[in-house]
């Protein structure tokens, strides 16, 4: 974001890369979303035997490619590793050995029957079983992140308490570090929690339970906002797996309700309300942190940004609800199908989870997967510690791997490819710097590498913005039943893959272009 703002201020080649990426991302989205030349997420199922299957896919989204370029190969590789563990390792093992894949179990049909055959079996196994490994890993990884962040968090809280006595105009604190008074933030949180407690009391009919759940909501919202912000820094706010954080909040709310012996039909709605609040908090935390980090890089005043963030939150609260209701009405909502033809897989998943917790069986189906994910997270934490102790430049942070397991496998592939393009650009500059040391070529390769990296980030940002803007337009056309489909009678998925790979080449070329210019200059001397 900061690079985009700098490019807009300076103009020239920087803004050109941004515009190019935006135009290409927009064109790609129009061809995909409006004319439907190819699927957004082409997938395939591979049979490894009579029982075992695995799923492969490639999500055709330029935005994910841009995310990979921005986060770099180390993080992109770990996200891809998570996808491989979930889909190439986890699903084949589960379909081979689990008894509920081909036989009815847990009071319902088999996973094979739910999938309607082997073609969709990997997706069903992942959504109902394997992704909970990612949830368990996120739980441990999120708690570990908070442990690692305990000193900065404590320092920030203490600084906030000190600022409560000084105010935003205190000249002892540098302008670029002045936040809103902690007293104002704390009072705002309390004032917002009070009406939520009344809402919970209306649902539960138990004032003590309502107050407790409101406190749990604030505490869990604070913790998972930090986790959500951390994950947004890994894969971007648009692709941050907030639903995983929301599931954790849902489980925490369910446990708190069970402590008050809340059962029956009132438990799930109350838990869903808590999860909804935490979901919003975790979602906007990533955006807010990105805004504040961009402001820090540009020299903005934090308390002014924070004030405008609050204004934006209030405005969004009034704007989002009618927009969502309009989309639901346009999807043919009825009393029997409240969401119409909207699939809403995450919402259905959370509704199923909340009902399961308050049922007689509880989480007996998902618990083993969650424990496996927690164990995997511990292994990754220990491995990361040993690698750092050995002085290795590489590490195994939990969150990227957990995100890779939780997201569809096709999502991790373009992120990895984008990270690979960025790494190839960096590798080219390392080789050219070595040539400079050997006296083969001359030039300021450090400045060239910095310029190339900045251009690649701007190009990637353009891909993300272009796809997002045209995605909104396409969604509006689809909601209005505007006929945008195009059917030429054959599949076009490979065309979409080829075009996306061309974007990969462009991302690499944009990164190495300053270096190529230096090489041409050397040849001319």
Report each predicted region and the residues it spans.
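Alpha-helical multipass membrane-protein architecture
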Residues: 1-525
């Amino acid at each position: 974001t900061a690079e985009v703002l700098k490019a807009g201020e300076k103009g020239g080649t920087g803004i050109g890369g941004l515009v190019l990426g935006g135009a290409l991302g927009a064109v790609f989205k129009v061809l995909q979303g409006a004319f439907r030349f190819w699927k957004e997420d082409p997938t395939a199922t591979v049979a490894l035997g009579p029982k075992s299957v695995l799923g492969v896919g490639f999500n055709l989204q330029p935005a994910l490619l841009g995310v990979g370029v921005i986060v770099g190969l180390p993080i992109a590789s770990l996200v891809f590793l998570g996808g491989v563990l979930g889909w190439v390792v986890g699903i084949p093992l589960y379909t081979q050995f689990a008894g509920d894949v081909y036989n009815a179990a847990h009071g319902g049909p088999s996973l094979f029957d739910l999938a309607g055959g082997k073609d969709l079996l990997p997706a069903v196994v992942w959504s109902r079983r394997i992704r909970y490994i990612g949830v368990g890993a996120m739980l441990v990884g999120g708690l570990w992140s908070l442990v690692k962040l305990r000193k900065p968090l404590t320092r920030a809280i203490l600084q906030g308490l000190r600022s409560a006595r000084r105010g935003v105009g205190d000249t002892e604190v540098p302008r670029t570090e002045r936040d809103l008074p902690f007293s104002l933030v704390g009072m705002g949180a309390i004032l917002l929690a009070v009406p939520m407690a009344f809402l919970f009391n209306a649902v539960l009919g138990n004032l003590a339970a309502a107050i407790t759940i409101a406190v749990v909501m604030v505490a869990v919202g604070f913790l998972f906002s930090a986790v959500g912000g951390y994950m947004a820094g890994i894969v971007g706010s648009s692709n941050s797996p907030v639903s995983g954080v929301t599931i954790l909040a849902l489980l925490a709310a369910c446990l708190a309700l069970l402590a008050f012996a809340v059962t029956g039909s009132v438990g799930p709605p109350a838990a869903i309300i808590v999860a909804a609040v935490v979901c919003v908090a975790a979602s906007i935390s990533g955006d807010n942190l990105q805004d504040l980090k961009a402001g820090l890089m540009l020299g903005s005043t934090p308390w002014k940004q924070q004030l405008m963030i609050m204004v934006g939150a209030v405005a969004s609260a009034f704007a989002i609800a009618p927009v969502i209701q309009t989309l639901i009405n346009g999807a043919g909502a009825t009393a029997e199908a409240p969401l119409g033809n909207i699939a809403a897989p995450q919402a259905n998943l959370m509704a199923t989870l909340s009902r399961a917790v308050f049922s007689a069986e509880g989480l007996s189906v998902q618990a083993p997967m969650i424990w496996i994910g927690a164990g995997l997270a511990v292994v990754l934490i220990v491995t990361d510690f040993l690698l750092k102790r050995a002085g290795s430049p590489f590490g195994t942070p939990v969150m990227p791997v957990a995100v890779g397991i939780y997201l569809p496998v096709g999502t991790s592939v373009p992120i990895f490819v984008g990270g690979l393009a960025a790494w190839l650009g960096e590798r080219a500059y390392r080789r050219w710097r070595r040539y400079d040391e050997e006296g083969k070529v001359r030039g300021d390769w450090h400045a060239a590498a910095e310029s190339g990296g900045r251009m690649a980030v701007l190009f990637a940002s353009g891909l993300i913005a272009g796809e997002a803007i045209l995605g909104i337009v396409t969604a509006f056309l689809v909601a209005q039943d505007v006929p945008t489909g195009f059917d030429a009678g054959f599949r076009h998925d490979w065309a979409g893959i080829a075009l996306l790979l061309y974007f990969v080449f462009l991302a690499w070329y944009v990164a190495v272009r300053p270096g190529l210019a230096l090489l041409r200059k050397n040849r001319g001397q």
